[in-house]
Amino acid sequence: MPSPSRIGIIHGALGAFAVALVVKSGQVQLWQGAAWAARAERQHFAAATVLAPRGRIVDASGTTLVESRELVRLSVAPPELKSPKTLAAALVRAGVPRAVAARASDPKRKWVAVPGRFLPADVAKIVPMRGVYAEPAAERVGVVSPSVRRLVGRLDAAGRPVDGLELALDSALRGEQGTATVVRDARGRRFESPTAPGTAARPGHTVALTINYALQDICDRALADAVSRMGADGGDIVVLDPHSGQVLALASRRPDPRTSAATAISEPYEPGSTLKPFIAAKLLELGRAREDEVVNTHNGEWVLDGRRITDSHKAPRMTLREVIMQSSNIGIVQFAARLSPREEFEALRDVGVGMPTGVPYPAEAAGTLREPARWSRTSPASIAMGYEVTVTPLQLAVAYAAIANGGELVEPALVKEIRDADGAPVFRHARRVVRRVI
């Protein structure tokens, strides 16, 4: 039996320990309480970004051209796994290659990012597992028309716009991200807190294009048939309302299927004889020629300054009207000689040659029309025949629309309307006349 002195010593030691414990507890609560509480909150709570659903792109009638589909990215911390074999089997069932599943469940590895993105339903049993970390992602899905895909554009693996209307209209489509507080339980699983403060994500706007998908499909098939029959490398079709400026269809076809841009907007070419009507319009406007005025067309062959000019439709003489109808090179060169280089330049610049049209497309090409000071001695004749100049198919369509609508150059439009998540319009296309040209 311990002596009274030893018992006293033990009691004293226990009392001193109790006092020290009370003092330390008070110190922790009074002086360090806030710091420890913050540390505990950090361990159990975390801030998370809530992705905003990207807005849809639809055609003029409301048919969906592209929309977002919610997906999930997975990462694994193998040392945290409770049952590596269970995870490996679940990953294989979700379509993950066995080699990747084995890597993700190897406890010797610290962290494994599982390649690819998954439908939430396919990984619903995987996401709650301890050691599995899920991150929301999205995928753009829509119609299969290559022309529409080129016009709409692409997103990269991180969901950022790369080109096309996805890039041009990103501020309207991307929405606003929200925030949420995530709670970790004892097993490391994460759940969104139902009580902690957060902000709701605001979905992106819906963008309605001027494109009519049914008409677009007709143009795609017609273009494919024409390219095949003609043995051509490619082609473009632009269908434009000459009065409103709305682009109703925009089909492009190139031999390389990887071509990512809408070439009717992005690839200029020499227009050739299609520019002759604008030279004729300038002549008529300035009173330098009459429709029935006749010039010598030399039976289809003529030499000017040592340069041989020919016509496919051979005739000794033609009126200005016939020159345009038969696309006579000889006739238009002789008539165009009545214009100064500056006047000939203005005839084309006025209808938009060499200038961007104003459509919201990042890769739009302006084409080329050099200032008269940079012309050579043969340039006036070449340009009258549509050479030494480049235009895009859209530019040429806009120029011809000015003839069709009575003389006004109307800015083309690809976007008909933009609506917010509630369906309220935030933008509507309105006809814009750039200038009167004829």
Where are these regions (language model features)?
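Beta-lactam-recognizing serine transpeptidase/beta-lactamase-like catalytic domain environment
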Residues: 185-196, 235-273, 278-438
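Short, basic/aromatic recognition patches
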Residues: 35-51, 215-229
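Short beta->alpha transition motifs characteristic of CBS
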Residues: 52, 68-75, 155, 249-255
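Short extracytoplasmic
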Residues: 45-71
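Hydrophobic alpha-helical transmembrane signal-anchor segments
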Residues: 2-35
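Small/polar-residue-rich segments within soluble enzyme cores
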Residues: 30-31, 75-76, 80, 85-98, ...
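Conserved, well-ordered alpha-helix/loop/beta-strand core segments that scaffold catalytic motifs
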Residues: 191-235
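Short, small/polar residue-rich loop motifs at catalytic or cofactor-binding pockets
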Residues: 44, 49-53, 177, 231-235, ...
